[in-house]
Amino acid sequence: MTEKSHKKTAKGRAGSPSPTSARNKKADNGARGNKVSERLKAVKELQKTETKKARPEHVVNLIGDALWLMGLAATLYLAISLISFDMGDPSWSHSSPVVEDVANWGGLFGAYVADVGYYLFGWSFWWWIAAACVVLYKNFRLHAKQTENEAYNHKIAAAALFVLTVFSPVLEYFVLGGKYADSLPVGAGGMVGIRVGAVFAWLLGKSGSLLIILVVLLLSLSLLVQISWLEFLNGAGRAVQNRLSALSGKVMALGKRRPNTKTDGVDTQNTRRMVKEAKNITAKPVALPEGSSSNRKSVAVSVAPPPKIQVSLFEDDEPRQAGEYHKPTLNLLRIPDSEPVSINPAELERTAELIESKLAEFGIGVQVVSATSGPVITRYEIEPAQGVKGSQIVALSKDLARSMSLQSVRIVETIAGKNTMGIELPNDKRQDVMLSEILSSPVFAEAKSKLTVALGKDIAGTPVVGDLAKMPHLLVAGMTGSGKSVGVNGMIMSMLFKATPDEVRFIMIDPKMLELSIYDGIPHLLCPVVTDMREAGQALNWCVAEMEKRYRLLSHAGVRNLEGFNQKVEAAKAAGKPLLNPFSLNPDEPEPLEKLPLIVVVIDELADLMMTERKAVEQQIARLAQKARAAGIHMIVATQRPSVDVVTGLIKANIPTRMAFTVQSKIDSRTILDQMGADELLKYGDSLFLQPGSAEPTRLQGAFVSDDEVHQVVNYVKSQAPADYIEGLLSGEAALETANIVNPNADSDELFDQAVAYVLESKKTSISSLQRQLRIGYNRAANLMEALENAGVVSSTDLNGSRKILAHKDHL
């Protein structure tokens, strides 16, 4: 009995659920219902999406074209109906006799539409036509994909049209009230203008109402057209300013400019024109499209600014003095006639997404954070995902270039001051960098050094110049067609624009007889352009002897560099006590010291020079590179074959500044830069510039100067002063004379003259032959041979231990 009762009780408890379990069950049912409804919504959205995707693209375009044409037809119909409105036609606002012929060009329907519009809004009904034209134009531009900005906002335009059709009739009523009663159903302003105008006049008065209405109308018009009045006024102001500047420039040129008169430095009339062109090119902030398909942040874009031109504010009215040297002016160079290549933000965004997707295919996760666009390339800065090594991305440079269908991709593993990497891609449109852009920039005009050289523009489009005095020597390498020779020409031209022949002198060695021969005859040269490699050795010997001579002068004057020496000479001359030459050939009447010019040795092709005069050239270049900086002697050494047998360790170790254009292999890139990268450049001036003490090179686009421009500048410089060569510099006479000044004790041995005569007559340069001829010991013969080398009679020993005779018998 008890057992049965327990079973019933348990059954009863199981059959009647508790309140808590009922509530839980209810909640579960509600959650299930929500999930079902969410799934149904997702299915419906998916069906809509699939329906849209299933619709062919040409059908969508056809529907869009049809709607646009229908809107155009409706606008034209409304316009002709308003134009041909006649008060005698049947209308809604007043009764009229039944006529068979309706005067309105839109027919009976057009007459009714025009009557209703004019009755309600007066002439302000034409705002509907204006709004329709704006909408049609914006949609046409958007449909034709001629703009990269946001789509036209129709909701804002509708709100602006509503405000215009309310406030414009009020303005019309206040200004033209009572007029056009015979032409319009209720006169100017329509019923809206009459009713709303009465309210405004009662609340604010007529003057206050006009002020408020004008402000509202301007704002509404701005929203309808979707332009900024501030930008419009700013652009109008710039146009007026440019016009006034051009007019004032012409007036100043007519009033001040004299015939057949040129000014030093920058040509004013020419630079004003450059300023005018530069002002018309305004750099606006780049707005990237919203709603990117990727979930990453938008790419920050940096655009190369237009070049800033350094302008001389006042022209030089002082007449020239006869025989005075004047530097060339910028009107001898070609001004760039092309505007900076416009940046397409949408294209940058697409490229950034492409970089991320292509690297993701190789299992590398990155995020593009910014992009900097220059004249030739665009650098995309990327943040690698956690655990991704930079070397992994660098190793994919060729694969990335292939997958993106590009000529080359350069990956910068480290960017100074940032935790990002750089991927440099070539631009679709290449922009030339002209030499005149660099020479007219403030950074070049404000440089004080006479050895300032124009290098080009960096990755952001900023002009870059270098100071050869601080480098103090430059090694340039690049294959044929890379722009190496053009870059060297640009450097020489920069110094011609910056310095007079009294300040800078050149020695040019051109084995190819093509690149530097154009400068033959300019007053800056110390000797004719050297094309014979045997004479090149003599020229370098003279440079070494001149370096030693200058060091002795600096030591005697108690200064540390050539600049200090020239300042001391100038100060002594100004005080009336000029310094005398302590190493004069006439000790009884020494000549006064003069300021010494800087000397730049330009070697266009080192490889050919090393093949013919390897031992002597390598030693002389190494000696100059080690010691010549303080003496004011600097070198620009160029080669198209930067292999280890040309750019030897001895030369490379003493020239820390390097500039690499496109080279053929990674080995050549390592030779010139100690790292890869130069083999991935784009030719035609694309280069890497490695400064002393810098681990990472700077990518530059070299400045271009044409042969015609070089000819014009050279002809101008020749017309200013004749060539002033040092006699005997290439024959060894000048080197021998300089060596005697440097080492006056070289002939202290009583047998020195006999040794010179024997070497020049017998053509034998060995120590043993000199020992046998003069019947002296080996040590004395070796000292005499060393004295002959220091005096410039014989060269140093080559790889075989032999010497060459540098002097001639006539020197005796």
UniProtKB/Swiss-Prot annotation:
Keywords: ATP-binding, Cell cycle, Cell division, Cell inner membrane, Cell membrane, Chromosome partition, DNA-binding, Membrane, Nucleotide-binding, Transmembrane, Transmembrane helix
Cytoplasmic topological segments: 231-812
Domain FtsK positions: 461-670
Disulphides: none
GO molecular function: ATP binding; DNA binding; DNA translocase activity
Topology in membrane: Multi-pass membrane protein
UniProt xrefs under InterPro entries: FtsK/SpoIIIE/SftA (IPR050206), FtsK_4TM (IPR025199), FtsK_alpha (IPR041027), FtsK_dom (IPR002543), Ftsk_gamma (IPR018541), P-loop_NTPase (IPR027417), WH-like_DNA-bd_sf (IPR036388), WH_DNA-bd_sf (IPR036390)
GO cellular component: plasma membrane
Region annotation (Disordered) ranges: 1-36
Regions that span the bilayer: 63-83, 116-136, 156-176, 184-204, 210-230
Positions contributing to ATP binding: 481-486
Feature: compositional bias, Basic residues: 1-11
Any one of the GO BP annotations: cell division
Biased composition (Basic and acidic residues): 25-36
Compartments it resides in: Cell inner membrane
PANTHER family registered for this protein in UniProt: DNA TRANSLOCASE FTSK, SPORULATION PROTEIN RELATED
Family: Belongs to the FtsK/SpoIIIE/SftA family.
UniProt remark on domains: Consists of an N-terminal domain, which is sufficient for the localization to the septal ring and is required for cell division, followed by a linker domain, and a C-terminal domain, which forms the translocation motor involved in chromosome segregation. The C-terminal domain can be further subdivided into alpha, beta and gamma subdomains. The alpha and beta subdomains multimerise to produce a hexameric ring, contain the nucleotide binding motif and form the DNA pump.
Oligomeric and partner information: Homohexamer. Forms a ring that surrounds DNA.
Function: Essential cell division protein that coordinates cell division and chromosome segregation. The N-terminus is involved in assembly of the cell-division machinery. The C-terminus functions as a DNA motor that moves dsDNA in an ATP-dependent manner towards the dif recombination site, which is located within the replication terminus region. Translocation stops specifically at Xer-dif sites, where FtsK interacts with the Xer recombinase, allowing activation of chromosome unlinking by recombination. FtsK orienting polar sequences (KOPS) guide the direction of DNA translocation.
Protein name per the record: DNA translocase FtsK 1
Native species: Neisseria meningitidis serogroup B (strain ATCC BAA-335 / MC58)
Name of the gene this protein is made from: ftsK1
